[in-house]
Structures are given as C-alpha cells and as structure tokens.
Amino acid sequence: DSDIGFNPDDILTLAAIAEPGSDKQIVCGPYPKKCISWEKVKVAVDKGYGDENPQALADYVGDYVFNPASGKNQIRIDEVAEVMEGGTGFMMIQRSAFEQYEKAYPEFHYLPDHVRSEHFDGTREIMAYFDCVICPDTKRYLSEDYMFCQWARNAGIKVWMAPWMRLTHMGSYTFGGSLEALAKCNVSATADPNEKLK
C-alpha cells in the first residue's frame, strides 16, 4: 500500500522467501495499525527504556497487523513465522497462490459493472480475491487482508511473516515500532495480550 514505509531491501527479502517453487507462497512484513498502544509505552517507560532517549519510546507504540497461526502464542523475531492472518499492505504473493485460490473459490468470479476500459468491457469474469466478510464460524469481522489470508489457508496455502522487518504506517502520525523492542518488553505485538514474541 502507498501508506506503508519500508526499506527497499525488504522487497528483495520477500521475493527471496517467496521465490517460485517455494512452499512459502504468501509472505508479509509486519506493520503497525494506526493507533498508539499507550499501555505498551507505559511498560517501556516503567522499565526505563526511554530514560536516556525518550524518542526510543516510539518503538513501543504499535499493535501490529497480523495474528499468529492457531495454537501458537509465541513468534521468534529472527525467522520466518507462520501466521493466521497478515496485512496485505506489504505482502508478496506467488502467482501459484492466486491460481490455487481461484480454483478453490469459483464462486468469487463475477462480471464487473465498470465497463469503460478495454479489459473490463463486461464480457469476461474477474476474480474477487479481497473482500470484507463476517466469518460465519466466529462472527468476527474480517478485513480484506484477513479474509484473503483465512480463505487462502482454507485452500491449503500457508501465510508467512518476516517479523524482523521494520515498517511504518502513515496516517495522522507515522506509526512505527519494533517487534524486537516489544519482545524485550515482554508485551504482545497485537491487541491480544496472550500473544508474545521472543
């Protein structure tokens, strides 16, 4: 997405992890939601992490756009980790994943009603890979990011994350942070207080 800040080397890293033929067909980088988690900042303050440099507290502000894979409440920050859901704002997806997804969900084909271009003239179906839904099992709202990941996993495609990356998310503030810093504080990287990093 255009509001994600990243190091260009991170793109090459995702490409290397998700290279054709790899079992890692979907790989994302972690970026923070557009909010400040004041309780995490307070933990860092209480531990003295901002005493010498108060700007270092910016590493502790975020809830990240991912959820760990089912049954996993710890993620190592120095290796690729399987996740249940990750943000599509910084994600690399192999063509094979799109093809597998399309075969699994033929009901997501539709005829577009925007027909003012050569390739969208209303005569061919296109695929809705990203949509917002209410999960029928949990009644949880799934954003287009999370819906895509959940349906991909249901189609047998695992979703992976490179947790060492440091991305930003631009809003009214440049939301940043560091999963490594959050691990040092022993706080959750998401809004779930039971999930931990190590």
Where are each of the predicted segments found?
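Short acidic donor-binding/metal-coordinating loop in glycosyltransferase active sites
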Residues: 1-4
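C-terminal catalytic/acceptor-binding lobe
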Residues: 103-198
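Conserved catalytic core of nucleotide-sugar-dependent glycosyltransferases
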Residues: 7-133
